[in-house]
Amino acid sequence: MRMREAEGVSAERLARIAPVMRAEVDKGTFPGAVSLVARNGRVVHFEASGYLDAAKTRPMTKDAIFRMASMTKPIVSVAAMMLVEQGAMKLNDPISNWLPELKDLKVETAAGDVVPTRPVTVQDLLRHTAGFVYGGSTRSPRIKKMYEDLNIEALEKDITAGDMLKNLGTIPLAHQPGTFWEYSISVDVLGLLLERVTKKNLDVVLREMLIEPLGMKDTTWWVGADKRTRLAETLDSDAQKTGMLKSYRHFDDPAVRTYLKGGAGLLGTAEDYLKFLQMVANGGEYAGRRYLSKKTIEFMLSDHIPGMGGTTAASTGPGYGFGLGFAVRAQDGFAWTAGSKGDVMWAGAWGTSFWIDPKENLVGIMMSQAPSNRVQTRMLFKNLVYAAVVE
């Protein structure tokens, strides 16, 4: 019996992925993609489809480098929990312990700005319940304008970490801390907090704690000239391409910047990201080295937002809550794809996505650069993979 069947995955059904990916290339969904599936810690599917470049002249390769955007967030979240395990901070610590620029935050209400009922905590940053927002998605016109005017997200021009925090401290929160889930800059703020805790730049923190020990050799904040030919591109026809390229400036050496976004800054390969995800799927251990305890991983992959307002559905579809750095399937029904209660996922705005299914010991990664079609592609790939799980 071949390995694929031995891992309870049908080789015949996995073979459906390649023609579907080719069809998406032909339809103009993306130039190309890399898809990877592991079951029981073994790779059962790893394919490159289509092309690296927008002109469709260079074949996609398995070692292609992708802008991962928000798939940076789980890595920063794991680093934060490693520091919690080391006693450097606690989840219920106010973030102002390290970020005094944010000690006088107010909360926007219909009756005016009010004092928060409690401080924003480290846990709030990890689970997006701090009251911070993304300017493009918040329902508050006032907060949206303030984020834009004060360059909080550094979308088209850089800002120093100090100025970002100083400016953020003047903007009210959209919700009382710990009451409402709203996708936000929280992990950008968490990255700055990690810098204060460790007294190191965020790129150094992640490199020392996770990237180098895991052997993620192509995971980086910027693409040097020697690897630029491996960078996957977006079709010129993608309506979001121009704006996204302005917002994600990955050809700049981070040494000249003081604000590295913990929520969106990394690039990497599918194979690199599998090492990180497999460590999480293994309960915090990879290749003989322990990064987090089994119980900490279980805690991170639990739903931390029951009873709160807000929903993750725009990114996950229905049926998901949110843990510490990961969306968590809260129940077996309602979701748009097959899966298991307790499976976790997240994705990136450029078109990358992943999930971990602890019950099935299954990890899936889809790497493409198709911001306008990102939800469609992540659901399509997930359906194809679960259709191949037969034991």
Regions from the language model: what does each represent?
Residues 5-68, 88-90, 104-111, 375, ...:
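Short, conserved catalytic-motif segment at the N-terminal edge
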Residues 10, 73, 269:
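Short, conserved phosphate/pyrophosphate- and ester-handling motifs at nucleotide-, phospho-/glycolipid
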Residues 15-22, 41-43, 66-95, 187-195, ...:
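Active-site SXXK
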Residues 48-50, 94, 368:
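Short clusters of small/polar residues that mark proteolytic maturation junctions
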Residues 103-339:
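Short, surface-exposed loop or secondary-structure junction motifs
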Residues 343-345, 350-359:
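Short, surface-exposed beta-strand/loop micro-motifs that present aromatic residues
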Residues 354-355, 361-370:
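Short, well-ordered beta-strand elements
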